[in-house]
Amino acid sequence: MDLDKVKTFYNNVAPQLRDLFGIFIKRCKEDNITISAGHLAYVTLLSLVPFIMVTFTIMSAFPAFASVRSKLEHFVFSNFVPTASDVVHKYMTDFVGNASQMSAIGILSLLVVALMLISNVDKTLNRIWRTQSDRPIVYTFAIYWMVITLGPMLIGSSVVVSSYLTGLAAFTEEYTPGLGTFLLSLVPSGAALLAFAILYMVVPNRRVYARHAFVGAIVATIAFEITKSGFALYVTNFPSYELIYGALAVVPILFLWVYLSWIIVLFGAEFTCSLGEAFENKKAEHAPRKVPKE
């Protein structure tokens, strides 16, 4: 009896999984996610310093986040930049310090560059979801401005929460050795998972089911953690970039990591979109059709 249930379950699920991965592979080829990731990586490096400067400027306007900056820098560079984090951190700090001395026109131009990154991410993800209608310009600008202003506040709040969890983990370590450290190690992955899910639900200009967004976010988070470990292992054991570029090795390493990160983001987006196309369309096909009354 149990064997019959397993066979029935397999016969029902296997075709859907086959359709899902078929749609996923087809979409990845059609959308050329590696090319889109390269474009986003270039725009990210161009917009990184302006975006960080705007983030820290907005956070400094709130006294509650005055002490968060150093914690935020440590959290980001230690968990999301697998190698050469100290060198990248130093360069970013110097760049942001130089940018903060610019005139009002210069700061405004940096703000435009930061908005350019958000705009490119928005357009790329909506192209993946095959969005037909564009948002009104006023509505689009309002969304971008909300990301610029509210984003730093949310980031600061998340860092405060992670600091609280660090203290809580240290407290639980006294009573349950190993448990606090294990739970604390899940914080970066949890932050990445939440960021992916929000990105896949909010950015597309169409409805995305939360369950699909979270499944896609789980896939992207697993891929991100595996890639981060593999990238760190490669750069540590095969330092060919340092032999070729010397002191400038951090530049291609950072670009390569940003490029791989965007591939993972688009990879998760394609998987999320494929879930909706495979399962929701299948439900629509099997839904009973209404017969018009005569």
Curated annotation (Swiss-Prot):
PANTHER family: INNER MEMBRANE PROTEIN YHJD, UPF0761 MEMBRANE PROTEIN YIHY
Family: Belongs to the UPF0761 family.
Keyword Transmembrane helix: yes
Cellular component aspect of the GO annotation: plasma membrane
KW Transcription (keyword) present: no
Transmembrane segments: 45-65, 99-119, 141-161, 182-202, 213-233, 247-267
Mode of membrane association: Multi-pass membrane protein
UniProt-recorded name of the protein: UPF0761 membrane protein MADE_1017605/MADE_1018330
InterPro entries associated with the record: UPF0761_bac, Virul_fac_BrkB
Keywords: Cell inner membrane, Cell membrane, Membrane, Transmembrane, Transmembrane helix
Chief localization: membrane
Pfam families: Virul_fac_BrkB (PF03631)
Localization, UniProt: Cell inner membrane
